[in-house]
Amino acid sequence: LVDTGLLVALHAADYPYHALARHWLARHDGALHTVGSVLAETAWQLPARERARVADFVRRGAVRAHAPDLPGYARMAELLVKYADLDPDWADIELVWLAETSGIRRIATLDRADFGVYRLHGRQRFDIVWPR
């Protein structure tokens, strides 16, 4: 799974983690998965001229974008209530939903504080694989 920080780092050469993100991606051998809200956050953080690159990244199949169905939104509502004290953002909760649905626990995120707390199905920890 990929969170906003990795995608911004890949698309913004002046971002502090740019070289680290490109190096990680060159060595990564699995599919990348994310959610629409992460793509929206990524585009919002890039200059207007660079935003189309995010859509092209998905179009080329470099990352697969997933969207919740109605039961997925119900699960997200449960998670938003459960983690309300952390004030989670929508993208985080959507990624937790995707992890639970897909069984993928590995995540590339700069948000170690929150993803260190979130649990899949209330039990399993995320495996934060980037940055290391």
Question: What do the PLM-derived regions correspond to, one by one?
Answer:
Residues 13, 62-83:
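Acidic catalytic patch
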Residues 4, 36, 89-93:
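Conserved glycosyltransferase catalytic-site signature
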Residues 96, 100-132:
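Acidic, PIN/NYN-like endoribonuclease modules and their adjacent C-terminal/linker elements
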Residues 1-34, 45-56, 121:
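Short, well-structured N-terminal submotif of metal-dependent ribonuclease cores
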